[in-house]
Amino acid sequence: MSKTYIERMSIDLRPAICGLGRQWEEMVPMRDGTRLRTLFYMPDTQGPWPVLFSRTPYLKNQSIYEYQGKIFAERGYGFICQYCRGTGGSEGAWVPFQNEKIDGVDALQWLQQRDYIESIGLYGFSYVAYTQLAVLDQLPPKVKTAYIVHFGTDRYGQMYCNGLFRHDIYTPWAKDNSGTNRILPYEAALDAGLYKPHIDADRVVWNLNLPWYREWLSHPDYETPFWKNSFWEELKAIPKKINIPVYFGCGWYDHHFGGMMCTYQSLSDYAKAHSKLVIGPWVHMKELCIEGHDTTDAYVGGIHGYEGALNWMDRCLVHGEIPEREVLAYGVGQGWRKLDQWPGSSKPLRLYLSEAGLAVQADCQESVRNYTYDPTNIIRTHGAECMCYAPLSDRGSVSQPNPNVRDDVVTWLSKPLNEPIVIDGAVKIHLSVSTDAEDTAFVVRLMEVTPEGKSYNIRTTATTLRYRNGEGRADDYTPDSRVECELTMWDILWKLQTGSYIRIDISSSSFPEYNIHYNTAEAWAMQQNPVIAHQQIWMGGESGSYIELPVE
């Protein structure tokens, strides 16, 4: 039987050293007079205490916060949890992400004045991590560190992949956090993702009015005021202003992984020199998710859970330590590795798409691989790094179908490896493509095929032709013209064994990981008339398609 979230997080948790003392609630005032419901849990020892502070919109998780309050108090720490504006008994209107900066700053200033608080460590997971990231450039003196898990500061990159909206994450999340108590089953929530035009889905399918969700749908272009002249742009700049040690925790197959890597790479020199990065083999709720490999040792020592948080807080809050930089990454096929930096040092291995498969040299003559993409006959996502609500069996790295199961998926295989290779960093793809449609999508999947013939997905990425530049800026496309697409997959640390094959699949759909592209140039959320597209992948010659692996 699989463990619950609390059970997973409590693996190897140290024994209690005291009891849970006083518990109480207060309505803490913000600068505009709005009061936010705040829960307090303190040890039964003499204060003042080091305190962990969280801000959350998730009333459904109150039992988790109560458990955290108990276990942290029993180990000498206070725990304070505040509900975001308009949630969990707090006053005001709930608009996701909008008020967390100002309210977070006000809450910390209020805590700074409490004499029972000795020091503060910010503690956040997912949206709760966002509420902490939002204030890391405006901290009062008592805040000494932050423990940030599964969130990042590149919101645009989290929501869109080269013009494709990440339905599995943000469509069910919008419904579940719409201010109603009605939680839909996953498949029912995805009905909205299939509705055309999708811009009307909240009102027609859910009978709700979610203007903030429609704003997300309406801005696939980064070069707009919605992204550039808003707090989202301010959020991207915060890592450069951080001047405290921060623990960053993420999973290879968590949907916030890409955003967290952007955050980590953007840190100020001081913050990077004194922060810790931990990357594990799990999805969002810390479930292990890599088939074909035994990763149970990933939980040893509780590095992923409450014990890992306490170890970090001990160093920064109790002992007053300023840690030196640490990078700890779980290599698939290797186990935990201590690294000097991330990504590590690597050299590029280029493999060309050719008539014979993946080759170390490009074919001299140009050739083309064709397939037909029908948006009414989509591929359902099975295995992915950027999914959250799908069943666990469809997330992470899972066994894949054999090649040639579908006519609209084309496959290239390398020769069997003569020795192991380790992918260390971001795989890059150069696609040379054309289509007879006004616009279309291409989905690229990298896999390992084991000597036993089992295929496992490693990384996936995708692009539309309008957003093929990778910069969030639309480019025109003329049907039947040949264009070049530069794609970058998320980082990975993965050892391919001797005798394995490298496999690349290219298709044009992966729903609900990405929205269904209907092969028109109309804004994606307005599209409602599917068009069949005839796709070409160009190989060989001077500008044929290839992949580039960073290998140790």
Which residue ranges define each predicted feature?
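C-terminal, loop-rich substrate-recognition/catalytic regions characterized by aromatic stacking residues
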Residues: 9-10, 199, 287, 293-552
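Cap/lid segment of the alpha/beta-hydrolase catalytic domain
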Residues: 44-112, 288-298, 438, 444, ...
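N-terminal cap/lid segment of alpha/beta-hydrolase-fold proteins
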Residues: 8-45, 413, 417-419, 477
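Alpha/beta-hydrolase fold nucleophile elbow
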Residues: 115-126
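Short beta-strand/loop motif that positions the catalytic acidic residue
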Residues: 242, 248-250
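Active-site-adjacent alpha-helix of alpha/beta-hydrolase-fold enzymes
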Residues: 258-275
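Accessory cap/linker subdomain of secreted extracellular hydrolases
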Residues: 74, 137-241
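Glycine-rich nucleophile elbow surrounding the catalytic serine of serine-hydrolase chemistry
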Residues: 124-134
